[in-house]
Amino acid sequence: VVVLALGEKNEWGGEAGSLATIRLPEAQYELAKFVQTLGKPVVITLFNGRPLEVKELAESSDALLELWFPGTEAGRVTADLLSGASNPSGKLSMSFPQTTGQIPVYYNHLRTGRPQTPENKGERYVSHYLDIPNEPFYPFGYGKSYSEFELKTSSLPKELNLGESLHVEVTIKNISDIAGKEVIQVYLQDVTASISRPVKELKAFEKVALQAGEEKTVRFELTSEAFSFYNQQLEKVQEPGLHRVFVGTSSEDVDVFEVEVGGYV
């Protein structure tokens, strides 16, 4: 196995550390491609302080381990993760774009006038790129594990009164032979509101530890606070209308439910 350490210098980020591109120096991409020709499994460990353009690196390696700037325990942590002494369970707090030209790419960006949806995907006059997918390469909340998990969300009510809480019940099972942890994430979308609202907002999450074959049930309560926002008058309000609830293991890998909220508060 080849463990290939790539990334940024720490002075390339932070205050007064702006760059015009989020690609690494080209020599690092060339090195990754060369190492792949050696016929050995390649694991890239990535040291960086920001999301990078990593598509080429991911495609020229067997695994990519995001370490950020890990400090003095970097060697021990890396050895534990790669040897299996520790099981990865972290999730990305930022989306990684397909390419530099896709930034800014946020999971919670505001809706556009002609958003791309599964129903109109492929049409020309919707908000999309012609040469790359709309989705980031690695979405917010993404992260892999040596374990494999299966999620099942109980049916949600179709209607909800203003001021009431929405209860979400999720059953998670470790269907692998390795003990591990997974992060269940719950997002919310206000489909139509008096002001432009994000396409998705993280409202709840919980990291669950499971032994091999173990199953647990996790319950979330989304109170009226989760449905509320500040309007143009800077008043915190909850408005009626259709809401979408997303439950999954990242901002993209989700099951979708619709709940109609009625009345005014």
PLM region descriptions:
Residues 37-42, 61:
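A short helix->loop->beta-strand "cap" motif at the edges of active sites that frequently abuts
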Residues 6-25:
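Glycine/threonine-rich flexible loop motifs
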Residues 194-230:
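Intrinsically disordered, low-complexity Pro/Gly/Ser/Thr-rich segments with frequent PxxP/GP/PP motifs
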Residues 27-32, 42, 64, 78:
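Extended, hydrophobic alpha-helical segments in both membrane/secreted and soluble proteins
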Residues 223-265:
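Terminal connector regions
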Residues 177-194, 200-202:
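Short acidic, flexible loop segments centered on an aromatic residue
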